A protein has these predicted regions:
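Extracellular S/T/G-rich loop segment that most often corresponds to the catalytic His/Ser-adjacent loop
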Residues: 264, 268-269, 378-380, 401-469
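Glycine-rich, charge-decorated loop segments at or immediately adjacent to ligand/cofactor-binding or catalytic sites
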Residues: 388-408
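Subtilisin-like serine protease catalytic core
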Residues: 52-65, 73-334, 410-413, 435-439
Length: 471
């Protein structure tokens, strides 16, 4: 689930049932593909893609491999399967590491959050909870003056985690109560609508066209339309919405228990590496689709969906290959997986690495820093999303960052991107986007972006961390 979905859903919940109808806002007035348009010619604050192609007309292009470190990609999608990176040194399906890179049958990339037995990590805990409980016994009630210099730095991180965890108490409990009641109401409304529509699955668009007869069905329609539109996801189905809602609710319930209950180690049970040994790096599997490839599929379509084929959408780049690296679960990613994902991308020819994820703590950031430095020696650019917390990154964190641990130096091969919009799409700067005069380099379209989604030939809107793709 996208982090924007979570944020907008939470903001919508307290008033979701207070209105019997949804007031259409200007965000619905932008066309599909507005992010590619030109302000002077088309009236939208897009990236002026046609002008860019006109500028390079007649010039010879070179194929660029873009690594997408994300939740996975639907490798069967009609608009993506022909632009996927193929490891030509590997023979598919023979169970042999033909290219001797340590990863067996890595045809389109690698899944760092999978097990050799074929199982995959779908959900995971939040880093703040992992940090808090890892050091709780060591630092609780300790006199910090007795600590070594190294431990003092870890103590500072733990105190920040403690403040966030303990401070989540009563307020978070009330939010979860609202979430639970609203989810139960959504399930009830869905059961009413499925009977009224005489179908088990329906999209927001189908629901909007439906004219209910009974007052009960009218109220149920109003509720679901509100949620669909609040997330700019009219193409989403009722089943997908309730599944994502349930996942989010589960995560929020875990947060309220975080102070007393240590998070489950989902990754360890499946991946089975020695996490603390960075040299134990040849783990995972080649299932790059795995469980929930929504975000990665959407991102990849924006980058390189086949252009001018009359299907779905046109991607930005017309001579690109997408390398799929799955390292981001529903929850917070682990630093080791991200560091190894970056190294895998570099070693296998990627020239750009797309990273549409983030978290507020990064205890093993030094591993990522070394991977970023390695990428720099190979001329590889890393593009990272600023994040969707509406926070000032000059005074808060969204890891990974360009700043190296224990240094004032920044990675020269790193760009941090915030999400922009359009006046017709709610404003030039997306309301949810992080920002920062010093820490955010540029803004790019990130509101109501239409692209490929899992399902083979399916498309829909999403928004948030995917803004960096336009850079």
């Amino acid at each position: 689930m996208s982090h924007y979905f979570k944020r907008s859903l939470l903001l919508a919940l307290p008033i979701a049932f207070a209105f019997s109808s949804y007031s259409q806002t200007s965000i619905e007035n932008v066309p599909k593909g507005w992010h590619l348009k030109d302000f002077t010619k088309d009236g939208y604050n897009g990236i002026s893609l046609d002008k860019a192609y006109e500028f390079v007309k007649g010039k010879k292009s070179q194929t660029v491999i873009v690594a997408v470190i994300d939740s996975g990609i639907d490798t069967t999608h009609e608009d993506l399967k022909s632009v996927l990176w193929i490891n030509k040194k590997e023979s598919p399906g023979n169970g042999v590491d033909d290219d001797k890179n340590g990863y067996v049958d890595d045809i389109h990339g690698w899944n760092f959050i999978g097990g050799k037995d074929g199982r995959n990590v779908k959900e995971d805990s939040y880093e703040v909870a992992r940090v808090y409980h890892k050091y709780k016994a060591k630092f609780k009630n300790i006199d910090p003056s007795t600590l070594s210099s190294e431990d003092k730095e870890i103590f500072k991180m733990w105190k920040r985690a403690e403040k966030e965890i303990v401070g989540n108490g009563q307020e978070s409990g009330m939010q979860v109560l609202i979430l639970r009641r609203t989810y139960d109401g959504a399930v009830k409304s869905d059961s009413i609508l499925r009977v009224a529509l005489a179908k088990e699955t329906y999209s927001g668009t189908e629901l909007e066209a439906f004219m209910p007869v009974t007052e009960e069905a009218k109220k149920a329609k109003s509720t679901f339309i509100y949620f669909f539109k609040a997330n700019n996801s009219m193409e989403m189905t009722n089943k997908s919405f309730l599944d994502e809602f349930n996942q989010y609710l589960s995560g929020e319930e875990k947060k309220t228990q975080a102070a007393e209950k240590a998070p489950l180690n989902y990754r360890s049970d499946i991946v089975k590496d020695n996490y603390n040994d960075f040299n134990d790096r040849y783990y995972g599997n080649n299932d790059v689709m795995a469980n929930t490839p929504f975000h990665g599929t959407h991102v990849s379509g924006i980058i390189g969906a086949v252009r001018k084929n009359g299907k779905g959408i046109d991607g930005i780049a017309d001579n690109v290959r997408i390398m799929t690296i799955r390292a981001v679960p529903d929850g917070d990613e682990h630093d080791k997986d991200i560091a190894l994902a970056i190294r895998y991308a570099v070693d296998n020819g990627a020239k750009i690495i797309n990273m549409s994820f983030g978290k507020s703590f990064s205890p093993e950031k030094a591993w990522i820093d070394e991977a970023v430095k390695y990428a720099d020696t190979k001329g590889v650019l890393l593009v990272h999303a600023a994040g969707n917390g509406a926070a000032n990154l000059d005074s808060s964190e969204n890891f990974p960052t360009a700043k190296f641990v224990g240094s004032k130096m920044k990675a020269p091969n790193w760009i941090t991107v915030g999400a922009s919009g359009d006046v017709k799409a709610g404003g030039i700067v997306a309301s949810f986007s992080n920002f920062g005069k010093n820490e955010v380099d540029v803004f790019a379209p990130g509101v109501k972006i239409y692209s490929s989604i899992p399902g083979g030939n399916t498309y829909g809107n999403a928004q948030g961390t995917l803004s960096l793709i336009h850079i």
